[in-house]
């Protein structure tokens, strides 16, 4: 496996003591130790006990300290501690007949919830392999590796501007660099020089076409700029 660059390697899951269904979207909340996701979930759902997650780096923050901070900032009951690595398989196809997907293929922290769409994209690539003349095994390997690197880059980009916290975690997160490829630069320029309509994918009524960086259109890059309150050229 190759390591994917990311500042997060652990998460504390919690059961919320408030009604998360009052919100219509998931939240990503910056914390001194990393960030926390809050997913609107009905109490009767099996995932309700795990719908709040305190993501942090265990090499920077001890588990006990992270749990204390989690409970101090969010009204939850701690239900589980997990540690993980961020990785992608060197060989997504084994012996020309075994196709890796799911956690056998890769794992990347939960920001942007990229897993499910990635699984679908990889499954489509494997299906295309069985359609004569569409793709070969080398293309699948190259495309899969490139796709996961683009997912890594887009997520890592979120950390580059830091947060309101001046802490060891955020110093570390901002220090992580990634190889900015030509496509990334093109999306950055495209999103900063065009308005929402021009960057929105055409299937949603815009003029942005169907091309994606990883699984994100130029519109997502533009939203990043606006979320960071960065003045654009439009």
Regions found by a protein language model. Give the residues of each.
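Conserved FAD/dinucleotide-binding core of flavoprotein oxidoreductases
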Residues: 31-86, 106-117
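Acidic/polar loop patches that form or flank catalytic/metal-binding clefts of enzymes
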Residues: 21, 78-81, 133-138
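Conserved, well-structured functional cores that handle cations and Mg-NTP chemistry
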Residues: 5-7, 25-35
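Central beta-strand plus flanking loop segment that forms part of the substrate or channel wall
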Residues: 1-22
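Long, low-complexity C-terminal extensions of enzymes
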Residues: 128, 132-234
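Tryptophan-centric aromatic hotspots in well-structured domains and transmembrane helices
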Residues: 35, 94, 98, 107, ...
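Extended charged low-complexity segments that act as oligomerization/scaffolding linkers
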Residues: 21, 73, 129-130
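Conserved mid-domain beta->alpha element of the FAD-binding
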Residues: 89-152
């Amino acid at each position: 496996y190759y390591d994917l660059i990311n500042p997060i390697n652990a998460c504390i899951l919690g059961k919320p003591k408030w009604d998360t269904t009052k919100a219509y979207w998931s939240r990503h909340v910056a914390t001194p130790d990393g960030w926390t996701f809050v997913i609107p979930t009905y109490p009767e759902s099996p995932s309700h006990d795990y719908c709040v997650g305190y993501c942090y780096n265990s090499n920077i923050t001890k588990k006990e300290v992270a749990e204390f901070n989690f409970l101090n900032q969010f009204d939850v009951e701690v239900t589980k501690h997990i540690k993980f690595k961020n990785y992608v398989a060197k060989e997504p196809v084994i012996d020309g007949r075994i196709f890796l997907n799911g956690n056998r293929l890769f794992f990347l922290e939960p920001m942007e919830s990229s897993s499910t769409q990635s699984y679908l994209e990889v499954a489509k690539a494997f299906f295309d392999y069985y359609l004569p003349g569409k793709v070969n095994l080398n293309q699948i390997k190259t495309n899969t590796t490139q796709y996961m690197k683009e997912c890594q880059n887009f997520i890592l980009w979120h950390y580059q501007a830091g947060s309101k916290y001046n802490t060891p975690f955020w110093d570390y997160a901002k220090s992580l660099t990634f190889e900015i490829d030509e496509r990334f630069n093109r999306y950055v320029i495209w999103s900063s020089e065009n308005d929402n309509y021009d960057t929105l994918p055409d299937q949603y009524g815009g003029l942005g076409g169907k091309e994606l960086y990883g699984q994100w259109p130029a519109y997502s890059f533009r939203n990043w700029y606006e979320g960071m309150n960065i003045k654009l050229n439009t």
